[in-house]
């Protein structure tokens, strides 16, 4: 599944087109390389879908792991020079478009505003597996659980 968005052609320095696509399993090592190159603590989920935003190379990524009757979104990361250009928002939208059901994520409380703009709201309930993870992860850092219907 490939989604392509083009930048505005008004400037000769306009950003090249960005493709949003499901990363084939055979290319999954590229996702780990992308995270490492940017010294991110993110890791590619071993199961589920890996989605990327690409120009000539990967510029953003996220993972969607099936859980209960929905998905758990992890690993959202955009290369620092491209932040502020709605790459993350467009990547989320492209990845969730073919899905149905709930999508959950955990984030630092400071990121709630960003995710609210992407259509997420505070999760009132979590699947048991995610509730247990949230409790475990919250021991070492502040986290909130958010939810969006795909």
Model-predicted segments: where are they?
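Acidic/histidine-enriched, beta-strand-rich ligand/metal-binding domains
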Residues: 74-75, 81-83, 117
């Amino acid at each position: 599944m490939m989604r392509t968005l083009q930048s505005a052609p008004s400037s000769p320095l306009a950003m090249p087109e960005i493709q949003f696509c499901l990363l084939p399993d055979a290319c999954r090592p590229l996702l780990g390389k992308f995270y490492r190159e940017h010294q991110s603590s993110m890791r590619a989920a071993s199961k589920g879908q890996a989605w990327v935003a690409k120009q000539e190379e990967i510029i953003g990524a996220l993972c969607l792991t099936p859980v209960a009757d929905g998905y758990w979104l992890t690993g959202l990361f955009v290369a620092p020079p491209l932040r502020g250009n709605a790459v993350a928002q467009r990547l989320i939208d492209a990845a969730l478009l073919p899905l149905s059901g709930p999508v959950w994520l955990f984030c630092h409380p400071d990121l709630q505003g960003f995710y609210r703009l992407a259509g997420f709201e505070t999760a009132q309930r979590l699947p048991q597996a995610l509730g247990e993870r949230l409790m475990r992860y919250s021991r070492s850092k502040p986290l909130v659980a958010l939810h969006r219907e795909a």
